[in-house]
Amino acid sequence: TLMRSSAASDVYKRQLYDGTQPNPTFDNIEDARSLYVENNCEAIIAFGGGSSMDCAKVAAARVVRPNTPIPKMRGVLKVLRKLPPFFAVPTTAGTGSETTIAAVVTNPKTHEKYAINDPVLRPKYAVLDPELTVGLPPHITSTTGMDALTHAVEAYIGHSNTRDTEENAKRAVKMIFDNIETVYRDGKNIEARGEMLLASYYAGVAFTRAYVGYVHAIAHNLGGMYGIAHGLANAIILPYVLEYYGESAHKRLAELAEAASITQPGMTDAQKAEAFIAAIRRLNQDMNIPDKIEQIQEKDIPTLVERALKEGNPLYPVPKIMNEADCEMVIRRLMP
């Protein structure tokens, strides 16, 4: 939603852009930017899920960087110019985009996702209203919630943490395990909806500082190649990547298992980590999230591997570095 103030009064006029699609494209962004510029808008309200917020972020970046095409913004610190006043109103509990410095957009010609990271992309204001999420269908509730869980887990197990990111990530994990199945089965439970919104926010705060990992690197590129919803891709991929990390992530995953109250006395760190991964698989199964991605095609695997590693290495501070063979193995495990 784009706003324009009237100089003659205190009334605000608005221009609405509602063409954003899941995995927003360059065209979506340029259309939104054109609407903003042509109507002399002065502020932006991003209302919706992660796709809407990411589209709005990059449209705002294009407003202040009119001579910089979107591909040139890819990576870190490529905007570096203050955005117009920016308000984020999430209607899903998952992406945490209302508090992150990141936006992800799709090049429709190459089917490649571009991650754009810059502190100026963090919205100035965020409104967390659980009433806006009560109408979400169960499958959106579940996959966006697992998206938030992925943010918290990848932030916590990485090597770029602070005390604050650790606390926010653990808090988010506990809140999600305590509430996600409740909101999946009873979408009108306003208290649980509020907890999920806060969990998504805390996870967003955590990964904005501590980054994510290979789950996101692979999910972004599956989304770009096949249009798979980001939360769904993360939910399916998460346990496979955690298994790949093995011993390098056991201690951290054990701590998250304790935060989620799924451990038993006498368990080793390895057993706690395995219990945590099993609990993620169980959540997926209980919420009818598949454990394979049918769209993956054999001919696309080399491109998926190349693009995932290009995104992940060396930016993401992961517990264990993937090489091409490792990444291919994980992607093949995702195939039916």
Regions found by a protein language model. Name each.
Residues 102-210:
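Carboxylate- and glycine-rich phosphate/diphosphate-binding segment that chelates Mg2+/Mn2+
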Residues 27-34, 38-131:
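Glycine/threonine-rich beta-strand-loop-alpha-helix active-site module
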Residues 160-168, 183-195, 210-215, 267-273, ...:
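Flexible, glycine/charged-enriched surface loops at secondary-structure junctions
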Residues 1-8, 12:
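Single conserved hydrophobic/aromatic residue that forms the stacking wall/gate
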Residues 253, 260-336:
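C-terminal charged capping/lid subdomain of soluble metabolic enzymes
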Residues 16-26:
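Short beta->alpha junction loops
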